[in-house]
């Protein structure tokens, strides 16, 4: 009788040990990452973790979120992300200036595929001819699915040119000093749509270009010219 009791106890202990292992395994698979937070920006879900901001797919990431966070974003509109997900091009237009001010950008090369007409990112296996006619864009990389990556490029909503010139906030301000005004003849500048897009991208990445451009080595005259350029930059964008 004692032997039977011992066998029963042993079986129960083994069952409990097995159940405990299953519980631990389940908890490890379902656990959430600590020290992370989420924010909704213009149709995208952005994860902040270790001071890094990353766009994530809510549908594939929600099981890793806290219940409170998941409930918070369940009714959010992720149309912009869905648009990027369903876009056949690797390069996707994005009108959200807030997104580009919040997430680090990078420079990538793209080309138009002759067969499909789609814009594709230059990869290791991209042919020499496609590389030769490629162009660079400042982008935010987004993993929209498993092994599926898209690149967002900032393109502001089209202004209404039929209603008149570009709004006054885009005009050269009058606070530029006389030296810069005369040197660059800014009063004669006229911007088309391509110029406007270039200036917008320059503004979004002004810190990057600022580090590349200043200080300017060289002669005194070149330094003076750089100071003038800096004054123009500060006057236009601040």
From Swiss-Prot:
The record's induction entry says:
Down-regulated at low calcium levels.
Domain of life of the source: Eukaryota
Which InterPro entries does the record match to this protein? Answer: ORC1-binding_dom (IPR037240), Sir1_ORC-binding (IPR021646), Y'_ATP-dependent_helicase (IPR050978)
A Pfam family recorded for this sequence: Sir1
- Classification via SUPFAM superfamilies: ORC1-binding domain
Q: What family is this protein classified in? A: Belongs to the helicase family. Yeast subtelomeric Y' repeat subfamily.
Q: What is this protein called?
A: Putative uncharacterized protein YPR202W
């Amino acid at each position: 009788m004692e032997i039977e009791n011992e066998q029963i106890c042993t079986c129960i202990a083994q069952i409990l040990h097995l159940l405990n292992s299953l519980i631990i395994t389940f908890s490890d698979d379902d656990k959430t990452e600590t020290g992370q937070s989420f924010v909704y920006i213009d149709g995208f879900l952005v994860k902040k973790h270790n001071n890094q901001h990353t766009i994530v797919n809510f549908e594939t990431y929600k099981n890793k979120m806290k219940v409170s966070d998941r409930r918070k974003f369940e009714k959010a509109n992720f149309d912009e992300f869905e648009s990027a997900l369903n876009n056949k091009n690797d390069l996707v237009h994005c009108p959200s200036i807030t997104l580009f001010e919040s997430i680090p950008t990078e420079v990538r090369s793209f080309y138009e595929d002759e067969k499909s007409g789609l814009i594709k990112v230059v990869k290791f296996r991209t042919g020499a001819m496609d590389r030769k006619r490629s162009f660079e864009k400042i982008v935010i990389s987004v993993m929209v699915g498993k092994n599926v990556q898209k690149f967002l490029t900032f393109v502001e909503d089209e202004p209404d040119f039929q209603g008149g010139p570009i709004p006054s906030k885009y005009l050269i301000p009058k606070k530029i000093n006389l030296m810069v005004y005369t040197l660059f003849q800014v009063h004669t500048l006229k911007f088309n749509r391509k110029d406007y897009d270039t200036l917008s991208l320059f503004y979004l990445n002004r810190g990057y270009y600022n580090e590349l451009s200043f200080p300017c080595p060289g002669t005194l005259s070149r330094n003076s010219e750089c100071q003038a350029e800096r004054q123009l930059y500060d006057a236009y964008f601040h």
